[in-house]
Amino acid sequence: MTQWYPASPALWQGRDDSIEAPDARRLFQTVTRSETFSPENWQQKIALMGFACDEGVKRNAGRPGAAGGPDALRKALANMASHQGHERLVDLGNWVAPTPDLEGAQQALRNAVSRCLRAGMRTLVLGGGHETAFGHGAGVLDAFAQESVGIINLDAHLDLRQTDRATSGTPFRQLAQLCDAQSRAFHYACFGVSRAANTQALWREAQWRNVTVVEDLDCHDALAQMTQFIDKVDKIYLTIDLDVLPVWEMPAVSAPAALGVPLIQVLRLIEPVCRSGKLQAADLVEFNPRFDEDGAAARVAARLGWQIAHWWR
């Protein structure tokens, strides 16, 4: 059974420079850590939550270990300088799935996300495998049932697989099916897709679903496509699979990318999303601390989370 736990205060530690000036602060000094899951108390804040689950990665024959991602990313975030926007972060703990019940874990996350959004918060979720996206995305769809929701995925993989049960490779097919069941349009864009890592069947599925697809080779010149997608929806859910980055920047994932999209290009792509006023939910997924020997990959991932919170309007 999926359970909720508050984040350990030991994760939020860092260098104290406050003697220099009142605003010489780091995230560990400005993040609010909640001992209860109580989003109703934190309107207009950003709910930082962990989804400590990699059952979907295991089912997808990937490298397990992403369940340790949320706490590793908290540690990496803790010592980063606190700037505008970061004071809005409220750590609402981890959803932990100690059993293979992926479906139950996704439902728990879905309910939590919907509750946060309906309470007037926005959500920043640290995965976990990309199975995080179904629970997170479904919660967004639930919270904004009368509005068009755009799903923007930065990922080497389309994650539209067809299997007999949910995995880390199926979340966007699941979200498409959920939209079908709710008689609403499925607005999905995937940037950074590796043609070498997706079969023709997956490309055909993306075409049939009218997915906006931008390959890794073309992301250097994709801002117009991003802006066009932003303009056509009311609300946005942004999900970043860290395997969109090149292996030399992000080795600590289930399926490292031989080519990938460099971090600077990813940041340029997500900036207009964050500043659009439409972003309601974001996540970083697939970080696997077992393959991060010196913590450098955690800092790369944390920089993305740091930047999202800073730019979020």
UniProtKB/Swiss-Prot annotation:
Q: Entry's Pfam families? A: Arginase
Cofactor binding summary note: Binds 2 manganese ions per subunit.
- The EC number(s) attached to this protein equal 3.5.3.8
The broad enzyme category this protein falls into is hydrolase
* Residues binding Mn(2+) 2, per UniProt: D155, H157, D241, D243
Cofactors per UniProt? Mn(2+)
Keyword Hydrolase present in the record's keywords: the answer is: yes
Q: Does the keyword Coiled coil apply?
A: no
Kindly list the biological process annotations in GO that this record carries.
Answer: L-histidine catabolic process to glutamate and formamide; L-histidine catabolic process to glutamate and formate; putrescine biosynthetic process from arginine, via agmatine
Q: In which pathway does it act?
A: Amino-acid degradation; L-histidine degradation into L-glutamate; L-glutamate from N-formimidoyl-L-glutamate (hydrolase route): step 1/1
Q: Sorted alphabetically, which SUPFAM superfamilies does this protein's record hold?
A: Arginase/deacetylase
Binding positions (Mn(2+) 1): H130, D155, D159, D241
- What UniProt keywords are attached to this protein's entry? Histidine metabolism, Hydrolase, Manganese, Metal-binding
Q: Which InterPro entries match?
A: HutG, Ureohydrolase, Ureohydrolase_dom_sf
Provide the coiled-coil residue spans: none
Catalytic activity entry: N-formimidoyl-L-glutamate + H2O = formamide + L-glutamate
Q: Which HAMAP family does the annotation name?
A: Formimidoylglutam
| UniProt family annotation | Belongs to the arginase family.
Q: Which PANTHER family match?
A: ARGINASE/AGMATINASE, FORMIMIDOYLGLUTAMASE
Biological function: Catalyzes the conversion of N-formimidoyl-L-glutamate to L-glutamate and formamide.
What NCBIfam families does the entry give? hutG
**Official protein name in the record:** Formimidoylglutamase
The organism of origin for this protein: Salmonella newport (strain SL254)
Upper classification of the source organism reads: Bacteria, Pseudomonadati, Pseudomonadota, Gammaproteobacteria, Enterobacterales
